[in-house]
């Protein structure tokens, strides 16, 4: 069904197209036609990672359902897990429009959304009543007007509020669209953030009687020394997983596109080699001590196989889902099935 409406979606403004697609999916789900959102029957491929059981290893990355408004509809697609957010302590509108650009010739997207979301309290209200039964990740960040030196307070506030409802929490310190955010990926700022988050997680685990894993999502634009320090701190503080990678500021592979001059993070096919290389390095540095989530530029079954070979335990898609729809999920799962 996605192939029938894709030409229309590609002619629409990118942000309106995403909104229309989600509304259309919601309507099908409400009418009891959610089965139409999935391709053929998907293989049963349960995975045990971070103490959680995933129906299959391919999930939806954060960014598509920022406020947890579409979980039931997206749940029909067949993802092994869904990550909502990024959510911040207070609502914020994000950056001015236009802020989302498709580069179809390159199967790429440039976004400078800026963590537009309704705030963590609105998300929690929805998570309390959701009928979605799969593994749920919540991606948390800081408000734009929060000074970098106080950013940790924003993450702690979000963690405390989403903890009872999240199966895991993803800490977003790598979006290029919030000033100063990437400073949190290294040095004393990273150490303070991870130290305080893991301490609070321990307190909350005792309070609620359940352990919620922490995943940190990193940028593809760090240098080797920064990645080495990051891995040291991940091991030091017992972080449960690393998602590699977020979008890139590089324009490698799209230099000839008129939209390449737009500010923001680049995702999709051009991100593939950079995200693959970072994942391979993390796999070597962390070994099997920390689970890895491969994300960024996964557009085909071959891409999925390459990420798994590099050490990924799980995969996430976003741009590939925008361009290929649910059929991509089917292709990825077939590619990483045990018989392959």
UniProtKB/Swiss-Prot annotation:
Q: What SUPFAM superfamilies does UniProt report for this protein, alphabetically?
A: FMN-linked oxidoreductases
Q: Where in the cell is it found?
A: Cell membrane
Cofactor stoichiometry and binding?
A: Binds 1 FMN per subunit.
**The reaction(s) this protein catalyses:** (S)-dihydroorotate + a quinone = orotate + a quinol
Q: Which GO terms describe its cellular component?
A: cytoplasm; plasma membrane
Q: Where does substrate bind?
A: 66, 111-115, 172, 177, 246-247
- Any one biological process term the GO annotation gives: 'de novo' pyrimidine nucleobase biosynthetic process
Q: What is this entry's stated membrane topology? A: Peripheral membrane protein
Report any Pfam family annotated for this entry.
DHO_dh
| Cysteine-cysteine disulfides | none
Keyword Flavoprotein (UniProt) = yes
Q: Which Gene3D superfamilies does this one have?
A: Aldolase class I
Q: Which UniProt keywords apply?
A: Cell membrane, Flavoprotein, FMN, Membrane, Oxidoreductase, Pyrimidine biosynthesis
Pathway given for this chain reads: Pyrimidine metabolism; UMP biosynthesis via de novo pathway; orotate from (S)-dihydroorotate (quinone route): step 1/1
Q: Which cofactors must be present for this protein to function?
A: FMN
Does the keyword Membrane feature in the UniProt annotation?
Answer: yes
**What Enzyme Commission number(s) apply to this enzyme?**
1.3.5.2
Indicate the residues that form the catalytic site.
Answer: 175
- Give an example GO molecular function: dihydroorotate dehydrogenase (quinone) activity
- Which amino acid positions bind FMN, per UniProt? 62-66, 86, 139, 172, 217, 245, 268, 297, 318-319
Provide the function of this protein.
Catalyzes the conversion of dihydroorotate to orotate with quinone as electron acceptor.
Query: What family does the entry list?
Result: Belongs to the dihydroorotate dehydrogenase family. Type 2 subfamily.
Q: How does it assemble?
A: Monomer.
Protein name from the UniProt record: Dihydroorotate dehydrogenase (quinone)
- Taxonomic path: Bacteria, Pseudomonadati, Pseudomonadota, Gammaproteobacteria, Chromatiales
Q: Which gene encodes it?
A: pyrD
